[in-house]
């Protein structure tokens, strides 16, 4: 399962997706397991995270990244700088 990351996506793309209308999620510096029951697309407003999929290689996600996490993926999040992101499931 692959995490898709678009670094500094075009503002027009973010507008097309309606990112500003998505809810916001925030998390302090921490480490925790997570499982995606459905796909999630999110846009990082702040933060620095290492996401390590079960059986996979760590991926770094930072402010300005548009990320899609696949359905069915289990992983560990290591929040290195507090996160603030818009998100959408499905």
Regions found by a protein language model. Give the residues of each.
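Short hydrophobic/aromatic-rich beta-strand segments that constitute the beta-sheet cores
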Residues: 34, 51, 85-87
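Ligand-binding loop in jelly-roll beta-barrel domains
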Residues: 71-90
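Short, conserved beta-strand element in jelly-roll/cupin
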Residues: 36-51
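Conserved short histidine dyad/triad with adjacent acidic residue
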Residues: 8-10, 18-37, 70-71
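Short histidine-centered beta-strand/loop micro-motifs
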Residues: 17, 32-36, 53, 59-60, ...
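Double-stranded beta-helix
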Residues: 1-3, 9, 23, 84-90
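Short acidic-glycine-tyrosine-enriched beta hairpin
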Residues: 55-71
